[in-house]
Amino acid sequence: MRVAALISGGKDSCYNMMQCVAAGHQIVALANLRPAENQVGSDELDSYMYQTVGHHAIDLYAEAMALPLYRRTIRGKSVDTGPVYTKCEGDEVEDLYELLKLVKEKEEVEGISVGAILSDYQRVRVENVCKRLNLQPLAYLWQRNQEDLLQEMISSNIQAIIIKVAALGLDPDKHLGKPLDQMEPYLLELSKKYGVHVCGEGGEYETFTLDCPLFKKKIIVDSSEVVTHSADAFAPVAYLRFLELHLEDKVSPVPDNCRTSNDIHNS
């Protein structure tokens, strides 16, 4: 099936794309919703639906995958917040509808890759939009065990870094910019201590993917800055704002049986 992937830049939407490909689907385009540029604090939009931290790097993410990217500015708010969603003018869900409608028209997709794990709020709204557009939502991570998922993501070579922290035990100075594989033991510890969701499904943290097996090139962060959103003494909320990034060619590892003695000597 021809599939468009709804991406935030984070690990979940990336891993769900990998699951789509493993199931035989073809990712033909990427779709992303972003905050208005003129909005104060536009890096971090107060949205029930969308991750917006890291949105400045999404163009580079699409370039790394060598896929067309469709973007739309989030104009709506969280208006209909009930357990069942019905079409509601001025709701941010309608921005998703317009975005996916465009992608369907341009790319003739039949399915949408969605990285939702636990949020019924998100699932209900994505399903509503997909039903109205006659699209099949593909959510392979839905209600999976989060410890298993995190381990799988790391094992499958998703190179992601922490770009937002918002939980007890997560320190902006220590943890922002840290690779996910290095954070895994600590996240498991926080889960046991404080009930933190290890995949960040409670909004405890957010990530940005710099490389994965689907990328043709990898993203390098040249410079960034820490922005404090809320200086809470126990659970400060802060995020990483990317200032400069570039793409770099990926070097394929040389199999041992193809390496010369000189390669081995210099390794």
Swiss-Prot record:
Catalytic activity: diphthine-[translation elongation factor 2] + NH4(+) + ATP = diphthamide-[translation elongation factor 2] + AMP + diphosphate + H(+)
Gene responsible for this protein: DPH6
Residues where Phosphotyrosine is found: Y97
CDD domains, alphabetized: AANH_PF0828-like
EC numbers, comma separated: 6.3.1.14
Name of the molecule in the record: Diphthine--ammonia ligase
Pathway: Protein modification; peptidyl-diphthamide biosynthesis
Record bears the keyword Nucleotide-binding: yes
Function noted in UniProt: Amidase that catalyzes the last step of diphthamide biosynthesis using ammonium and ATP. Diphthamide biosynthesis consists in the conversion of an L-histidine residue in the translation elongation factor eEF-2 (EEF2) to diphthamide.
Species assigned in the record: Bos taurus
GO biological process: protein histidyl modification to diphthamide
Top enzyme class: ligase
One Gene Ontology term of the molecular function aspect: diphthine-ammonia ligase activity
